[in-house]
């Protein structure tokens, strides 16, 4: 049984940077927390907790120590609160997310009605929106733009993991309304590259394994894309979930992983697949 690992499986730049910053902070003596999970990987979160870095949902019960800002970013008000409490802040917000926050702040201050293309329930989007003063709308698609009230000049940014096609559909709808439309392409291509690679790999194999947190939106999307092409697709978080029966009649297995999946988990899965291979 041949096993093919996608070249870009695993950590993207922003996640790698955030986890490095978190593990470095964990080595210090003072009390340290992450505001929300540092990334959408329960295994990384657990590892940090073992090192004494807990997760807090908000800062209401925190009066001192170090707070690590997660890769998705946090609300502007939460960042202000951390500074007001004179906590040591380790800002591990992905630089691409930071740029989106800054663009919303600028557009809002410059009098634009702001559209954020993305998932309103995602913490990254909630953080980006919070940097606007008022008249900031979250839209998931071009169709939703049609339902918005009449606007003046419009500014558009996107959740970093959105597809370019979706951003384009929103911008097209904004242009139809007339008036000034200012667009910042804040999409990071790490998601698109992983999705394209997974699409190509799923076409070549008899079975796909997608590794990553069940709470990771980008990993779930990878699993959906692979399933559409190869129905024998399995989304797992760890090697322990692998079932030998999945590989009956299988000659080739493709493996990919979400942008928040650490290398050690990918390595464990590859080792487990070697064991399965050797037992046949």
Curated annotation (Swiss-Prot):
Keyword S-adenosyl-L-methionine part of the UniProt annotation: no
EC number: 1.17.7.4
Cofactor(s) the protein needs: [4Fe-4S] cluster
Top-level taxon: Bacteria
Record-level GO BP terms: dimethylallyl diphosphate biosynthetic process; isopentenyl diphosphate biosynthetic process, methylerythritol 4-phosphate pathway; terpenoid biosynthetic process
Catalytic activity: isopentenyl diphosphate + 2 oxidized [2Fe-2S]-[ferredoxin] + H2O = (2E)-4-hydroxy-3-methylbut-2-enyl diphosphate + 2 reduced [2Fe-2S]-[ferredoxin] + 2 H(+); dimethylallyl diphosphate + 2 oxidized [2Fe-2S]-[ferredoxin] + H2O = (2E)-4-hydroxy-3-methylbut-2-enyl diphosphate + 2 reduced [2Fe-2S]-[ferredoxin] + 2 H(+)
Pathway linked to the protein: Isoprenoid biosynthesis; dimethylallyl diphosphate biosynthesis; dimethylallyl diphosphate from (2E)-4-hydroxy-3-methylbutenyl diphosphate: step 1/1; Isoprenoid biosynthesis; isopentenyl diphosphate biosynthesis via DXP pathway; isopentenyl diphosphate from 1-deoxy-D-xylulose 5-phosphate: step 6/6
Cofactor detail note: Binds 1 [4Fe-4S] cluster per subunit.
Residues binding (2E)-4-hydroxy-3-methylbut-2-enyl diphosphate: 40, 72, 122, 160, 216, 218, 260
UniProt xrefs under Gene3D superfamilies: 3.40.50.11270, 4-hydroxy-3-methylbut-2-enyl diphosphate reductase, catalytic domain
Positions annotated to bind isopentenyl diphosphate: 40, 72, 122, 216, 218, 260
Catalytic residues (UniProt): 124 (proton donor)
Annotated binding of [4Fe-4S] cluster, by residue: 12, 94, 188
MF-aspect GO terms: 4 iron, 4 sulfur cluster binding; 4-hydroxy-3-methylbut-2-enyl diphosphate reductase activity; metal ion binding
Pfam family, one: LYTB
InterPro entries: LytB/IspH
Keywords: 4Fe-4S, Iron, Iron-sulfur, Isoprene biosynthesis, Metal-binding, Oxidoreductase
Residues holding dimethylallyl diphosphate: 40, 72, 122, 216, 218, 260
HAMAP family, per the entry: IspH
Family affiliation: Belongs to the IspH family.
UniProt-listed NCBIfam families: ispH_lytB (TIGR00216), PRK01045.1-1 (NF002187)
Function of the protein: Catalyzes the conversion of 1-hydroxy-2-methyl-2-(E)-butenyl 4-diphosphate (HMBPP) into a mixture of isopentenyl diphosphate (IPP) and dimethylallyl diphosphate (DMAPP). Acts in the terminal step of the DOXP/MEP pathway for isoprenoid precursor biosynthesis.
Protein name: 4-hydroxy-3-methylbut-2-enyl diphosphate reductase
Organism encoding this protein: Trichlorobacter lovleyi (strain ATCC BAA-1151 / DSM 17278 / SZ)
């Amino acid at each position: 049984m041949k096993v093919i690992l996608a070249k870009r499986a695993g950590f993207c730049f922003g996640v790698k940077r955030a986890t490095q910053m978190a593990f470095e902070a964990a080595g210090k003596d003072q009390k340290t927390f992450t505001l929300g999970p540092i990334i959408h990987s329960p295994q990384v979160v657990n590892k940090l907790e073992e090192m004494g870095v807990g997760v807090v949902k908000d800062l209401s019960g925190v009066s001192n120590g170090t707070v690590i800002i997660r890769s998705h970013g946090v609300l502007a008000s939460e960042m202000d609160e951390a500074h007001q409490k004179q906590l040591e802040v380790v800002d591990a917000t992905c630089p691409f997310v930071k740029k989106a926050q800054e663009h919303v702040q600028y557009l809002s201050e410059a009098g634009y009605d702001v559209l954020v293309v993305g998932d309103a329930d995602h913490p990254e989007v909630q953080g980006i929106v919070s940097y606007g003063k008022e008249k900031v709308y979250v839209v998931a698609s071009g169709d939703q733009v049609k339902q918005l009230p009449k606007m003046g000049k419009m500014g558009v940014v996107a959740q970093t993991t959105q597809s370019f096609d979706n951003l384009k559909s929103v911008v097209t709808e904004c242009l139809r309304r007339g008036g000034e439309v200012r667009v910042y392409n804040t999409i990071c291509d790490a998601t698109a590259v992983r999705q394209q690679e997974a699409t190509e790999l799923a076409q070549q194999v008899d079975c796909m394994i997608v590794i990553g947190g069940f709470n990771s939106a980008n990993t779930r999307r990878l699993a959906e894309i692979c399933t559409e092409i190869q129905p024998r697709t399995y989304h797992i978080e760890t090697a322990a979930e692998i079932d030998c029966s999945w590989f009956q009649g299988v000659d080739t297995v493709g493996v990919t992983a979400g942008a928040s999946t650490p290398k050690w988990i990918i390595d464990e899965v590859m080792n487990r697949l070697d064991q399965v291979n050797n037992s046949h």
